[in-house]
């Protein structure tokens, strides 16, 4: 039993003989370092106790002990002897305890200095959603929420609402007083005669009466006059819409005569195509009733020759374009289409525009004399067959 060496696993000289450990000088441990054993060891050291080769290893192993169940981080000086399962002795000598107390005081001073350097953050109580949803930059809202959330201040919401209601009422009363003072009616200043005669008080009263009647009040609401006091005239268009009230029968008749009568629907008709059997005399008698816009819109020379109003539906071109069903520009003596195709541009006689022509005459008009082929029929849209 005595031959087994006392092996200390925390010793850096583990596995060596005891003689080599005894021959080495024993450095004196500092007072604030305690050996990693469960029993108290005197500072002077003994042969059987744990001995260290240098103070560097002792400090390192005391700060970070490799004990089972101990913390992996280095322990502070004020935590030694208080952490469980760290291998530090709970019972220490008086010198070690005094050193630990000095270190504790020093660490407390350092913590106080760090707290003074760091800004202080106060933890506020949790706030309701209504405060976050409200207007943060509204000082009245913040004051209202703070006074409701603080538990020490008992604030009555009804009293606050009553005070606000009284303030609003007082403000409304002041505004009404200002409005009544500003809307006070004064006689209209006459710029042509700035110094009116004081001998006609009746005329001044008559001038002030329409101003008073125009502005009426409904439940404290002062209506603005529709028209200026200088004019006092209603437009004629509005006068026609307003029904006459308190008028004598003779005045009502005069008002009705002044109002324009509605247009009669059955008298006027749109000018259209006349029947084919109607004579020129009947059409000439109806020409004064036709509005001027229709005659002015027609720029064709047929209006001068026939004396009939020409509209877009009744406008007719040359007989060649009508037979070919082409649009005619109605230029005389030859239209543009007939000139381009070198066709015979024939115009109907006045008064015979709507009459049907016999088939032989139509064929004669649609045929031309060709130099090589003789008399041929003109086809629509074909330009190859041309006359001289």
Swiss-Prot record:
It comes from Candida albicans (strain WO-1). Residues 318-345 bind DNA. This is Zinc finger protein 1. It comes from the Eukaryota. One of its GO terms (cellular component) is nucleus. It is found in: Nucleus. Residues 351-367 have a biased composition (Basic and acidic residues). GO terms for molecular function: DNA binding; DNA-binding transcription factor activity, RNA polymerase II-specific; zinc ion binding. Perhaps a regulatory role. May be involved in transcriptional activation.
